[in-house]
């Protein structure tokens, strides 16, 4: 039987998952109360600078380095429009049956991280960034809520690598302004706000210094409250350098 190298495994799996979700566990089942689930929304829209994107990618790479058996990682492109749907990828690392890592388990973890880094490269594609027509944070949150619901009782963290400026025809925070409280109440009454109760939300990439940035932050504070969660001031940041700070 042919033995694949780590790079070969990464390339083969990443090629398969370029535009689809790797829905299965990386190596079989996972114990329901083991590990954490990380859901990452990746915004590469034109409103973000190269420095912003480089910082976001480094943070995600560092987070991948910290993943352990039992953890699940989900990557979602913050995007709407164009001929292609938003890209996404999700997979997890199996928890060792006896709780102790074998050499095979360690290789499995390394292979998972290699695939995750390839997926990160795909989602931070600079050519793809030029095709993005709108930034759909609301759609990303709805998809993230679906993944959080299916996280199999893992503690779940939603990391948004974004400036948090929504740009869709219905809500364009640049050209049409920021929706008011009545808009949030209307959506909440119609049960159109995705529920993220119990999910730790962390934002890295937001404008935290200007008046407009403060207004956008105030909007999201109220929106996340309606979604059943809360973003603490320490977790709504322009930049996070240490992945250990991705926590509540």
Predicted regions and their residues:
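Sec-dependent bacterial lipoprotein signal peptides
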Residues: 1-21
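Bacterial signal peptide processing site
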Residues: 22-26
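Von Willebrand factor
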Residues: 34-154, 157-159
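Acidic/histidine-rich, surface-exposed loop or edge segments in extracytoplasmic proteins
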Residues: 34-47, 121-127, 201-205
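P/S/T/G-enriched low-complexity
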Residues: 36, 199, 203-248
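Extracytoplasmic/secreted cell-surface and envelope-processing proteins
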Residues: 48-52, 83-87, 167-171, 211-214, ...
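VWA/integrin I-like adhesion module and closely mimicked acidic/polar interface patches used
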Residues: 165-218
